[in-house]
């Protein structure tokens, strides 16, 4: 009887070890995939900014494939190709509850007016203006692709929001708005001078 119990125990331990090893390999593979994607985006962003006479010091990348409770808004130094800062950022709630987090793992994207959804694609960060939200500053976003061509008509802007945290919230998600990329007040105050005094337009690229 004791031998049988020992055999069962050893078997269970073996299965648990296999599960852990498989999980580690899976995480490793995901890390490689994400790193490859990041390198690809960095290369394309650099080429775009150079060819279109955009700001070649930095740009903003937002990776919507990342859980919204994790930092997925990146300030990319185009000179060093390094991520200098990362922050939480909201996405649009779509048909879900405003300020909820029901689509924290699977955002719905749309270019349609009143869809309350975020739009993927490259944006030109435009004029600085007054905002009802956060620190009362926003920047117009001009869509440069078919997937975000209605950004102007939809009044899509980059702004801060009191509801967005400075710290990661995972497994909870960042509160969802009506389609504008919104970051915390403190994060916005760090970025505002970079955008305000840039002599060339700055790229914001939202992708997944």
Question: Where are the predicted features?
Answer:
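N-terminal Sec-pathway targeting helices
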Residues: 1-16
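Cell wall/extracellular polymer interaction/catalysis modules
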Residues: 23-178, 185-202, 208
């Amino acid at each position: 009887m004791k031998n049988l119990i020992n055999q069962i125990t050893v078997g269970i331990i073996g299965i648990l070890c296999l599960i852990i090893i498989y999980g580690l390999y899976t995480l490793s593979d995901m890390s490689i995939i994400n790193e490859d994607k990041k390198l690809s985006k960095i290369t394309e962003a650099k080429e775009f900014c150079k060819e279109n006479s955009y700001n070649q010091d930095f740009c903003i990348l937002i990776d919507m494939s990342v859980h919204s409770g994790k930092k997925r808004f990146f300030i990319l130094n185009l000179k060093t190709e390094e991520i200098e800062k990362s922050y939480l950022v909201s996405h649009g709630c779509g048909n879900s509850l405003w300020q909820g987090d029901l689509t924290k793992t699977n955002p719905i994207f749309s270019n349609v007016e009143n869809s309350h959804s975020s739009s993927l694609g490259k944006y030109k960060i435009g004029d600085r203006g007054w905002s009802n939200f956060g620190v009362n500053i926003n920047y117009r976003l001009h869509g440069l692709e078919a997937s975000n061509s209605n950004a102007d008509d939809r009044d899509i802007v980059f702004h801060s929001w009191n509801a967005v945290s400075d710290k990661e919230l995972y497994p909870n998600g960042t509160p969802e708005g009506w389609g504008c990329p919104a970051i915390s007040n403190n994060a916005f105050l760090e970025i505002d001078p970079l955008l305000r005094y840039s002599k060339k337009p700055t790229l914001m690229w939202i992708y997944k």
